[in-house]
């Protein structure tokens, strides 16, 4: 689901996710019961509730905070705060249940029943908001429905990609398909940044971006006297129809980013075995991240990079992209 941000609230995740639908209804009923019980008990006994007045309003703001987090699809942003205040609220809920559960007053009994239900809801919410995506609990909760919520790790990764893109030119054409390297890209250190969409595949030795001879040459000589002539000479090799730069073999080594595509293919993985992974669950790529790939449950993928929580993989039809590692199992 695309991040909603300031585009408004959508309560569909609460309605379609059975866990949140059930716990939200329970939380409101329990809070109202405990609140009315506290009011009556305070009016009758003038003060047996004490600090539970703080607890009842803490639970109110916790419930509203959970609903806002789900409706705004901001798990990655608010899960830590919700977990902290949820743990504090759980302690107060247990104290509230203990304060009136065995009392001989109906109002205190109602208050205790409300806090007991709130404690159960607090535990379920804590288990969800503190569960990592690789954990069994996260998968069990997702079996009740994802609600279209963005997983926390994908949300963080998507933000880092979007924040990085304008700075180094990768997402705007620096290394994108058919994009050329401008002098701005070279001057700002575009070579040192991590590509967004994997324009250069180190395993297959192919490059999807085209290099602009003039702009790359101009940028390469910004920091050295006479650099313009030198860079034009180093980039003076013939250019193919696809825009790849063929530099003289004697000047650019195998580690040069200006290496010819034909030379790159020699460093490929001819005959190299790529590990395969089986999809444990069906996955639909996020529409706001073009790097992700969708796959069906049981589909076999070739894994080209196993580092991190998001693996680079290739489908049987040749589609390349990234996939969440917790959805895959190596064969």
Curated annotation (Swiss-Prot):
Biased composition (Polar residues): 231-245
Membrane topology (Cytoplasmic): 1-19, 68-81, 131-331
PROSITE patterns per the UniProt record, alphabetical: SH3
Main location class: membrane
GO cellular component: plasma membrane
Alphabetical list of Gene3D superfamilies matching this protein: SH3 Domains
Biased composition (Gly residues): 218-229
Bilayer topology term: Multi-pass membrane protein
Annotated keywords: Cell membrane, Membrane, SH3 domain, Stress response, Transmembrane, Transmembrane helix
Residues passing through the membrane, by range: 20-40, 47-67, 82-102, 110-130
Pfam families for this protein: SH3_1
Subcellular location: Cell membrane
Region Disordered, annotated ranges: 218-269
Entry-linked InterPro entries: SH3-like_dom_sf, SH3_domain, Sho1_SH3
Similarity comment text for this entry: Belongs to the SHO1 family.
Stated role: Plasma membrane osmosensor that activates the high osmolarity glycerol (HOG) MAPK signaling pathway in response to high osmolarity.
Assembly: Forms homooligomers.
Protein name stated in the entry: High osmolarity signaling protein SHO1
Organism: Schizophyllum commune (strain H4-8 / FGSC 9210) (Split gill fungus)
Organism ancestry: Eukaryota, Fungi, Dikarya, Basidiomycota, Agaricomycotina
